[in-house]
């Protein structure tokens, strides 16, 4: 007898999660965006949704939901994607998805400690993505003024961190409360 390798491909569940996740992300980003007063910068509830999807399905689904959802929003809203921010949202989903194994939401438990640590991670991820990746992308790709894009990045970092801390945390807690806790007992 030989050992069979577990299929490491993209599962049907992941494909469906990506499609539904990106569609909901697009709708939230398009229709529930609150202006901040800084041009092209909004309080975005879609980032809280991305936290749930990435926490449930991992980094690849998080990456794709961020990329696809943001691309759709920009294409519909502005006529073309703003690639530096599309890429940044994808990277944000990827980074959030790295928390999947740690959060272990499928086991129906989410401690306060895990939730606090997740929020520290999402805050660090927000800083990396919106203070570094997005502004540098704007400068390199679009030749935007540094002062403008770093202001946009700083504001986005703050509002997205708050959005994920509130909306993302509430979604994670609600999901876990809706799941039965898995015990360590196994039926034979």
From Swiss-Prot:
Transmembrane region(s): 15-35, 48-68, 79-99, 121-141, 154-174
Name used for this protein in its record: UPF0397 protein LCK_00164
Regions annotated as coiled coil: none
This protein's UniProt keywords: Cell membrane, Membrane, Transmembrane, Transmembrane helix
Domain of life: Bacteria
HAMAP family cross-referenced by the UniProt entry: UPF0397 (MF_01572)
Family recorded in the similarity comment: Belongs to the UPF0397 family.
Membrane topology: Multi-pass membrane protein
PANTHER family hit by this protein: UPF0397 PROTEIN BC_2624-RELATED (PTHR37815), UPF0397 PROTEIN SPR0429 (PTHR37815:SF3)
Keyword presence, Transport: no
A GO CC term assigned to this protein in UniProt: plasma membrane
Keyword Metal-binding applies: no
